[in-house]
């Protein structure tokens, strides 16, 4: 039995019959994600053990198909994209940047891309961070604001940096009239 503390945990109710991956990904990235190197080291040590059950502090006890869960943790802790796709993350003040980002998402989908739009002013920030790690590409769309970046995007970027965001292709959409500066800040 592996008592894994925060490892292999997930958000959600214990009694709920729900798919494990989405809430476990969000949990990993937002709770454990900064420690990918350490997780990789522990997974290597655990590889030689005969583990029949994983008991995390948060989430269900895992008893079957343990290889599936371990494979997810190997992927997440390596900071490699989990799947091919594009997150379009937007922070719009009056809706114009949002309209441009939604149009970009629509065009990407028309071209066959797996594109997901998230409005950083309204959507769950932890889910947006998890999606940034999930997909191999991210498009950041933000308005310039007081000589910098509109704060919801600034918060999103701070969270990504704090969780060691890496190994992704990033595109920028900047909106500004007389003093555009969001792209400079997003770099």
Predicted regions and their residues:
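Short N-terminal or domain-adjacent regulatory/targeting segments
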Residues: 53-82
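Short helix-loop-beta junction
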Residues: 101-116
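Metallo-beta-lactamase
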Residues: 1-64
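Short, highly selective alpha-helical patches that border small-molecule cofactor pockets
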Residues: 97-101, 105, 153, 183
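Conserved beta-strand elements of the Class I
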Residues: 2, 85-89, 171
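Helix-loop-strand module that forms the ligand-binding subsite of alpha/beta enzymes
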Residues: 122-187
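Cofactor-binding loop segments of dinucleotide-utilizing enzymes, especially the Rossmann-like FAD-
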Residues: 6, 89-93, 120, 174-176
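Short gly/ser/thr-rich secondary-structure transition/capping motifs
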Residues: 71, 118-123
């Amino acid at each position: 039995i592996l008592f894994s503390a925060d490892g292999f945990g997930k958000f959600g109710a214990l009694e709920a019959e729900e798919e494990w991956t989405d809430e476990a990904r969000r949990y990993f990235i937002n709770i454990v994600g900064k420690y990918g190197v350490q997780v990789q080291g522990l997974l290597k040590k655990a590889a030689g053990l005969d583990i029949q059950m994983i008991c995390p502090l948060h989430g269900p006890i895992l008893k079957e198909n343990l290889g599936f869960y371990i494979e997810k943790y190997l992927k997440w802790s390596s900071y490699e994209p989990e799947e091919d796709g594009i997150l379009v993350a937007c922070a719009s003040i009056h809706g114009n940047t949002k309209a441009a980002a939604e149009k970009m998402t629509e065009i990407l989908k028309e071209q066959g891309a797996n594109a997901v739009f998230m409005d950083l002013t309204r959507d769950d920030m932890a889910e947006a961070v998890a999606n940034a790690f999930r997909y191999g590409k991210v498009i950041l769309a933000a308005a310039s604001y007081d000589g910098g970046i509109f704060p919801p995007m600034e918060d999103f970027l701070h969270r990504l940096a704090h969780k060691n965001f890496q190994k992704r292709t990033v595109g920028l959409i900047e909106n500004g009239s007389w003093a555009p500066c969001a792209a400079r800040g997003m770099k």
